[in-house]
């Protein structure tokens, strides 16, 4: 289910509202004692994008995610509430600064997280960025990254240094597993 709505005050000042929901359950009730289906995944999202003026926009996002760590074989799901504020300011046609703050609230797994990003883009090819992610729950660990990227056509080169946690990194619908590490990362992305 997807919903979209725009409220326009003027040509350069307007709000865009979006909402999306999706879910998946087990195919039949054979995995449960009472014959009911079990939740595998639930994803409910709402965001509001405000264009304050031609150069400045802010996006507010809320996402509620529930998923079954046992893929429906056992009862119980993990639940996360995610809040994001992203602000972008176009200094001129070639320079943009962007900041983002995220908060993930959960009583499950590693519990609460907070993250931030600062990025400066020199159009059309260069950007520099710094990120910080901190676990407020179980581990109390900081994960930081600073880097630079260059793009031309369908090719992108990124050089960064930081402390990264293990997990899947997804970009453009392509995901890869990355082990935990602290160090330098060189990434080349090309589309054919």
Report the location of each language-model feature.
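Exposed, low-structure sequence patches enriched in small/polar residues
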Residues: 1-192
């Amino acid at each position: 289910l997807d919903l979209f709505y725009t409220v326009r005050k003027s040509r350069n000042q307007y709000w865009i509202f979006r909402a999306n929901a999706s879910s998946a359950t087990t195919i039949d009730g054979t995995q449960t004692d009472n014959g009911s289906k079990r939740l595998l995944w639930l994803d409910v999202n709402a965001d509001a994008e405000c264009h304050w003026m031609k150069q400045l926009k802010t996006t507010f996002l809320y996402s509620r995610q529930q998923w079954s760590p046992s893929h429906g074989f056992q009862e119980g799901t993990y639940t996360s509430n995610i809040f994001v504020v992203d602000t972008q300011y176009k200094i001129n046609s070639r320079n943009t600064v962007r900041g983002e703050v995220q908060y993930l609230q959960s009583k499950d797994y590693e519990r609460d997280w907070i993250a931030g990003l600062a990025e400066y883009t020199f159009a059309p090819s260069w950007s520099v960025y710094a990120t910080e992610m901190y676990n407020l729950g179980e581990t109390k660990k900081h994960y930081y990254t600073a880097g630079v990227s260059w793009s031309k056509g369908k090719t992108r080169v990124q050089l960064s240094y930081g402390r990264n946690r293990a997990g899947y990194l997804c970009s453009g619908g392509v995901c890869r597993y990355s082990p935990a590490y602290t160090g330098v990362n060189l990434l080349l992305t090309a589309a054919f």
